[in-house]
């Protein structure tokens, strides 16, 4: 195994072990320090996050409509490795995964009944704002962050033959420095953010499955149950990781889409169908109409509303950035053979539509119960809001078990994808990292999630991941500069070659 791994593996293991040890020995101390640091960053650099993430969206749109969009992520005659449906399924599963199920009902309810962006809860305007801001937080901006990182990795790896490392994308502007300490530091930030972000999500996934089992069957909401769940899921995702990308992750992602589609369709039919579709349509219009205002909204003279923006919008932008090395590298790996335009439209548009539909169905179903006084969904914990909502619609047990299976499969695909990406990043960018390396990362992630659930340090570790987003956002800006420089150069070369290949019209001598 040792010959397959780079020094980044050992450096990140040491840093992660130190963070986990701190979380075990003194979780309150880690929580206080990380929370204070996070508060300082959101207060002092909130404007920066809003500007850079909006820049990411703008750059993606520019590339879609630019002639550069015709360039293929691979050799000119290369075909996509995965079919369109499997590709969409893997994008969706890796990009949002557990978060969609965790917050499907919880975020709209929170914006509507607990803490509204407008300040007034449980009003008709709060209802509209709830869905609009949920779309905003999970929409174009989130996927643009992923798309930028994925595009840079895919272009330099499949078009230029560079290793599949974050640092390799900066070679046009940093030169040989990417092979030295600077490159190692960049890769360490990316790997650390991935390990911490995914471990946190695994912990949240275990708590939601446990919350669902407790709500449905009265199984105790306790660490020992969560530990058993983590062990079971770990065995399953390690088996999937061992089987390879083309089998395990692909089949699980396709299964995810089928299960999610069945649950969505059922709830659309038995829920407040007309209200759901009206809200879906209205909220898309509201989202498009207000996207610029929401993208730059800081309310500097209104501390209460600014606190809401810090807690939601800026938190989300930092969280998506901290996840972008993992999701971006995975998306790049499964996108070989597509043009830049096809890639960006696929990554930005399709997941957004599915995400908006998901939140409309489950969010509106929950908010409808709340506004009619049929059930106080807002009183439930975040991890049980989905189950509380399902409890008030037909076939409760069937839909709840389906939701539990969906969470478990998302759990497995997220961890499986992460072990693959971590294996790549610590094996010199290998497209097929050794199983021993993937298994090592799988065990490390699960152990971290279990230890921090036990010590109560999971929230503190989540804050730590978000802190890594600030330096990594600067890395993404450098990646954009590097990519644009390379794409512009290649575009000039293509135009020059086209001119040389263009047949000259024969000269006709004039008769005098």
UniProtKB/Swiss-Prot annotation:
GO terms for cellular component: plasma membrane. Activity is stimulated by high osmolarity. The keyword Cell membrane applies. Induction: Induced by high osmolarity. GO terms for molecular function: transmembrane transporter activity. The chain crosses the membrane at residues 5-25, 45-65, 82-102, 135-155, 186-206, 222-242, 257-277, 312-332, 343-363, 395-415, 441-461, 464-484. Its main location: membrane. It is a multi-pass membrane protein. Keywords: Cell membrane, Membrane, Transmembrane, Transmembrane helix, Transport. Disulfide bonds: none annotated. High-affinity uptake of glycine betaine. Does not mediate either carnitine or choline uptake. Belongs to the BCCT transporter (TC 2.A.15) family. This is Glycine betaine transporter OpuD. The lineage of its organism: Bacteria, Bacillati, Bacillota, Bacilli, Bacillales. The gene is opuD.
């Amino acid at each position: 195994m040792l010959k397959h791994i780079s020094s980044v593996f050992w450096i990140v293991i040491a840093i992660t072990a130190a963070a986990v040890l701190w979380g075990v020995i003194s979780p309150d101390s880690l929580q206080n320090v990380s929370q204070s640091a996070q508060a300082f960053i959101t207060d002092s650099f909130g404007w920066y996050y809003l500007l850079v993430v909006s820049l990411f969206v703008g750059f993606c749109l520019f590339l879609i409509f630019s002639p550069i969009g015709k360039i293929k992520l691979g050799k000119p005659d290369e075909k996509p490795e995965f079919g369109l449906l499997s590709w969409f399924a893997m994008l969706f599963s890796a990009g949002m995964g557990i978060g969609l199920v965790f917050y499907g009902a919880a975020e709209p309810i929170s914006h509507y009944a607990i803490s509204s962006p407008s300040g007034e809860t449980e009003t008709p305007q709060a209802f509209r704002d709830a869905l609009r801001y949920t779309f905003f937080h999970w929409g174009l901006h989130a996927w643009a962050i992923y798309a930028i990182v994925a595009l840079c990795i895919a272009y330099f790896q499949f078009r230029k033959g560079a290793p599949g490392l974050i640092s390799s994308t900066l070679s046009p502007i940093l030169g040989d420095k990417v092979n030295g300490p600077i490159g190692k530091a960049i890769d360490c930030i990316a790997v650390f953010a991935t390990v911490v972000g995914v471990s946190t999500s695994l912990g949240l996934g275990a708590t939601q499955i446990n919350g669902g089992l407790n709500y449905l069957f009265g199984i105790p909401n306790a660490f020992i149950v969560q530990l058993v769940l983590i062990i079971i899921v770990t065995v399953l995702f390690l088996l999937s990781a061992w089987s390879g990308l083309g089998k395990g992750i692909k089949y699980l992602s396709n299964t995810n889409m089928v299960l999610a589609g069945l649950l969505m369709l059922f709830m659309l039919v038995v829920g407040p169908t007309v209200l759901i579709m009206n809200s879906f349509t209205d909220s898309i219009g509201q989202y498009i109409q207000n996207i610029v205002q929401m993208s730059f909204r800081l309310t500097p003279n209104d501390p209460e509303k600014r606190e809401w923006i810090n807690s939601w919008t800026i938190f989300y932008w930092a969280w998506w950035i901290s996840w972008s090395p993992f999701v971006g590298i995975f998306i790049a790996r499964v996108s070989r053979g597509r043009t830049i335009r096809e890639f960006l439209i696929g990554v930005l548009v399709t997941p957004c539509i599915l995400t908006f539909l998901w939140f409309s169905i489950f969010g509106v179903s929950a908010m409808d119960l709340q506004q009619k006084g049929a059930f106080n969904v807002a009183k439930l914990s975040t991890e049980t809001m989905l189950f509380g909502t399902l409890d008030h619609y037909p076939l409760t047990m069937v839909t709840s078990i389906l939701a539990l299976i969906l969470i478990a499969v998302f759990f497995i695909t997220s961890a499986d994808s992460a072990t693959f990406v971590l294996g790549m990043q610590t094996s010199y960018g290998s497209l097929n990292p050794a199983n021993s390396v993937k298994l090592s990362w799988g065990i490390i992630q699960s152990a971290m999630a279990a230890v921090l659930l036990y010590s109560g340090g999971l929230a503190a570790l989540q804050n730590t991941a978000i802190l890594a987003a600030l330096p990594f956002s600067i890395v993404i800006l450098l990646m954009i500069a590097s990519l644009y420089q390379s794409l512009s150069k290649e575009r000039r070369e293509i135009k020059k070659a086209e001119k040389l290949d263009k047949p000259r019209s024969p000269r006709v001598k004039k008769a005098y």
